[in-house]
Amino acid sequence: MDYTEFFAVQKGLAVCYSGYRHGQRPGHLYPTYKQVKEDLLIIEKQWQYIRLYSCDAHSKTVLEVIKDEKMTLKVMLGAYIEAEENNVNCPWGGSYALEQLSKNKKRNLQQMDALITLANTHPDIIFSLSVGNEACVDWTDHLVSVEAVISYVRYVKAGAKQPVTFCENYAPWLDKLEQLAHEVDFISIHTYPVWEHKTIHEGMEFTKQNYDNVANKYPDKLVVITEAGWATESNGYGIPQDNVNDDVQKIYYKALSHWSTSQSILTFVFEAFDEPWKGS
C-alpha cells in the first residue's frame, strides 16, 4: 500500500523532531519560537515530514511556527502516554506508586483531548496522529495495557479526521499487538539494528526483515517506520562503542533512505537534532 495515496500527500523524506537544547527538557523549559523557527528552517531544506511526540507547549510552538511562517512541513502529531501499570521487566525503573499511576491515567486522557483539539485546529498541517510511543514493549518504563491503547485509538478516531496509529517497536506487532493492529488506521514500527547488536554490514537487512515481518502479517494495513537510525556515540551500555560513529551512521542512513524511497515506505529518521537532556 502506497503511503502517498493513503495520506493524500506527496512523496518526501521524514524525520523525528524534538528541539530541546542545553538546559531545556520536557515539562520544565521549552524551546522558544525563535529557536523552533531556526530548527525548522534547517529541516525544511531536506525533509518534508516531521514527527512530534507530545501535545505539549513545544509541539504547539512548532505548529504555530509552521502556520505563521507559511512552511510546507507536514506533521505526524503524537500524544505521549505515561505509565498506567508497573513494569518489573524494565531495566531502569518502571515501578510507581498507585497514586502516580492514577494521575498518569488522567493526564493520558488529557493528552488525547489535546491531540484531538490540535488535529482539528491544524488539519492542513497535521496529516496523521499517534496515541502513544513505545508503551507496550516489554522493556518500557511507561507501560500501558493494549486494552487501554485500543480505547485511546477509538477515542481519537471518533474526535478527529486524520488517520490514527500507535508507534511501537516492531516486535510487539508480531504477537502482543495483534488486536490493536486491527483498530489502528495504519501500523507504525521502530527498528534499531544497532540496539540488537547488529553490525553495519547486517543493519540494513535486519531493518528490511523487521519491516517485512510486520507488513506480511498485516497485508491489508499500511506500515510506516516511525523511528529508524544509528547512533554515533555510546556510553558503553547496550551498544558497543566500536559499533557507533559518524561514518557508520552515514552508511546506514544512505542505505535506509535509498531502500525506503525505492519501496515507497514512509520512514522517519531518528532524529533531526541531539537532545542533551536524554544523555547518550
Segments the model singles out, each with a brief description of its role:
Residues 34-58:
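Catalytic domains of carbohydrate-active enzymes, especially glycoside hydrolases
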